[in-house]
């Protein structure tokens, strides 16, 4: 198993395995393969040390991944909360941030449904 950016990558095609790293999407993985001239259809275990080193070097130089990216995202959210803007308030309350409806749906952000007793007539 190859280890890049602190993540054990499975023995799948290179472009698929690279997406297991937080911050690398399918298109980014293809760009990395293109930049390092590695065949994206090659399995991870078939790569030699020079190819792995080239991939590591491109990722370190051009991409924010794993811990650095998670920290940056968390700091961005904290900044929004500290300045008290609308988006920060929505993050603080655990509600959808990007204008979605909340009268129905929004269960992912709001959590499990809390049933309230209905009004008696």
UniProtKB/Swiss-Prot annotation:
GO terms for molecular function: rRNA binding; structural constituent of ribosome; tRNA binding. It comes from the Bacteria. One of its GO terms (biological process) is translation. The keyword Cell membrane does not apply. The keyword Signal does not apply. Part of the 30S ribosomal subunit. Forms a loose heterodimer with protein S19. Forms two bridges to the 50S subunit in the 70S ribosome. Located at the top of the head of the 30S subunit, it contacts several helices of the 16S rRNA. In the 70S ribosome it contacts the 23S rRNA (bridge B1a) and protein L5 of the 50S subunit (bridge B1b), connecting the 2 subunits; these bridges are implicated in subunit movement. Contacts the tRNAs in the A and P-sites. This is Small ribosomal subunit protein uS13. It comes from Treponema denticola (strain ATCC 35405 / DSM 14222 / CIP 103919 / JCM 8153 / KCTC 15104).
């Amino acid at each position: 198993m190859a280890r890049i950016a602190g993540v054990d990558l499975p023995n799948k095609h290179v472009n698929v395995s690279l997406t297991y790293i937080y911050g690398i999407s399918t298109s980014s993985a293809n760009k990395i393969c293109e930049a390092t001239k590695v065949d994206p259809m090659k399995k991870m275990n078939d790569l030699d040390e020079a190819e792995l080193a080239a991939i590591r070097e491109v990722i370190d130089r051009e991409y924010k991944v794993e811990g650095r990216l998670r920290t940056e995202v968390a700091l961005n959210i904290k900044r929004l909360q500290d300045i008290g803007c609308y988006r920060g308030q929505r993050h603080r309350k655990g509600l959808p941030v990007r204008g979605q409806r909340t009268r129905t749906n929004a269960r992912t952000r709001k959590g499990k449904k809390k049933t309230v007793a209905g009004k008696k007539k």
